[in-house]
Regions:
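Catalytic nucleophile loop
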Residues: 16-35, 49
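Short, small-residue-biased leader/transition segments that mark boundaries at the very start
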Residues: 1-8
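Pocket-forming structural segment of enzyme catalytic cores
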Residues: 35-113
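Acyltransferase
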Residues: 127-153
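Short, surface-exposed beta-strand/loop micro-motifs that present aromatic residues
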Residues: 114-120
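Histidine-centered divalent metal-coordination motifs
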Residues: 27, 94, 130
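Short, conserved "post-DEAD/DEAH" coupling segment immediately C-terminal to helicase motif II
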Residues: 11-14
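Beta-strand-turn-beta hairpins that frame and shape the catalytic cleft
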Residues: 87, 120-124
């Protein structure tokens, strides 16, 4: 990492991780949590969640960017998904997706490959989809996050 990137990582660890403040990264914000991304070259991320952000390599006929509604398959309990049921739909707009995040993956969707939809590690959460564009399901995710922030921020 170069100086400015180290500063960002250090500040993230100081302000969010160490203090236990809830953090929600949406779309690119989630992608920044990983070790590295290959979007427009190879770039180091914050390294908070192991894994990489890679371009889609999809079967013929599937379009990139992935834009549209997909159902969420919840893999494990996660406070961010407190008001969400398995199979509810969320809205995606992206050309890259996270892979290799293992135990930190809370929910996935299917788009030619399993797409990590929600990650969670401690007080840090991320969604690849856009909750603000995901109707009632998205509002319920934002409601759960809002509840986590009460008295903390």
């Amino acid at each position: 990492l170069v100086g400015s990137e180290m500063c960002i990582r250090d500040r993230f660890n100081e302000m969010v991780v160490a203090k236990g403040k809830p953090f929600l990264g949406i779309c690119l914000g989630m992608q920044m949590l990983f070790d590295r991304s290959y979007e427009y070259g190879e770039h180091e991320g914050l390294g908070f969640i192991p894994g990489e952000v890679v371009p889609f390599s999809l079967p013929r006929g599937m379009k990139v960017p992935h834009m549209g509604w997909n159902s969420l398959q919840i893999l494990r309990e996660c406070p961010l998904l407190k008001y969400v049921s398995n199979g509810e739909y969320v809205y995606y707009v992206h050309s890259y997706y996270a892979t290799g995040c293992g135990e930190y993956t809370a929910a996935v969707s299917e788009y030619g490959v399993p797409v990590t939809g929600v990650v969670a590690r401690g007080n840090v959460y991320g969604t690849q989809f856009h909750p603000e564009k995901s109707g009632d399901t998205g509002l319920n995710i934002l409601r759960a996050f809002n509840e986590m922030t009460r008295g903390v921020l």
